[in-house]
């Protein structure tokens, strides 16, 4: 008797999603849904706006540039959804991550109201509020779960466009988010072991750094003539994983963190 009941239940479910007449005037039957599908979203890209709340909203809603979400600042930050996740927002520009290019088509962009650098030398930065980060963490967890996004694919604009972008900056709390299971981070014990090894063996050459950076997702060209490009990529990497010093120079701690991340699955 169970089979007829299941059959009736299935037919009832189908009858709820029968033919629909859309605005264009033709009929679409949505009774069946294919199992062979997944989300178009592979990446989450984080930005700061460099503007106040009012200007951020105006720029992101009245111009070509846009983002899926905008998180304001103040005592009670507001999370706005400006673009549906199923549609493309124009936030990433020329970009690359793990060989994927022009990430607008496959990412969710999140803009956070924050001034970024407070001086021309970019040595002073505005911090993010704890309330902003609490809201952001909840959003990131939800997005990552719904779209099945790998931790390594939650990135900053500077990670995917290191030659021209520096947001979300060195004060963005990547490590604190990683402790909540959001994003990629390194193992400190292994990094200390790698540091001891490099103190004994010496620092690897520029080709080693280029290869490891490419291995963990960054776009960087091989060759001794690409030192300035490599320096900017290293600076983006350091802002993300070693924000206490982000001069773009290769050093033992940077090498140790790179080595650990490159060994992660």
Pin down the residues of each PLM region.
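Bacterial N-terminal signal peptides that target proteins for export
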Residues: 1-3
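C-terminal motif of bacterial Sec signal peptides marking the signal peptidase cleavage site
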Residues: 11-13
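Active-site-adjacent loop/helix surface patches within enzyme catalytic domains
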Residues: 18-37, 42-152
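Second-shell loop/turn segments in exported
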Residues: 32, 57, 96-99, 120-131, ...
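Acidic, His- and aromatic-enriched active-site or binding-groove loops in soluble protein domains
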Residues: 36, 70-71, 170-193
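Extracytoplasmic/secreted proteins, especially bacterial periplasmic and envelope-associated proteins
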Residues: 64-65, 74, 131-142, 172, ...
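Acidic/histidine-rich, metal-coordinating catalytic segments
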Residues: 149-164
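Short acidic, glycine/serine/threonine-rich helix-capping segments at coil-helix boundaries
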Residues: 197-261
């Amino acid at each position: 008797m169970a089979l007829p009941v299941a059959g009736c239940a299935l037919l009832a479910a189908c009858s709820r999603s029968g033919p629909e007449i859309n605005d264009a005037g033709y009929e679409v039957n949505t009774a069946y849904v294919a199992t062979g599908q997944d989300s178009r979203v592979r990446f989450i890209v984080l930005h700061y706006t460099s503007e106040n709340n009012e200007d951020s909203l105006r720029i992101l809603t009245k111009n070509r540039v846009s983002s899926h979400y905008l998180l304001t600042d103040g005592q009670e930050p507001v999370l706005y959804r400006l673009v549906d996740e199923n549609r493309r927002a124009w936030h990433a520009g020329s970009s690359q991550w793990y060989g994927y290019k022009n990430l607008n088509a496959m990412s969710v962009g999140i803009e956070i109201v924050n001034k970024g650098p407070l001086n021309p030398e970019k040595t002073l930065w505005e911090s993010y509020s704890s309330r902003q980060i609490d809201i952001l963490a909840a959003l990131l967890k939800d997005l990552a779960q719904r779209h099945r996004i790998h931790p390594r694919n939650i990135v900053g604009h500077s990670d995917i466009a290191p030659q021209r972008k520096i947001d979300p900056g060195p004060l963005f709390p990547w490590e604190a988010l990683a402790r909540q299971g959001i994003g990629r981070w390194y193992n400190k014990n292994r990094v200390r072991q790698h540091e001891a090894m490099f103190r004994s063996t010496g620092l690897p050459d520029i080709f080693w750094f280029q290869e490891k950076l490419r291995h963990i997702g960054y776009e960087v060209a091989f060759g001794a003539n690409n030192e300035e490009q490599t320096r900017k990529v290293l600076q983006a990497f350091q802002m993300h994983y070693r924000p206490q010093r982000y001069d773009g120079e290769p050093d033992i701690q940077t090498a140790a963190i790179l080595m650990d991340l490159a060994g992660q699955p």
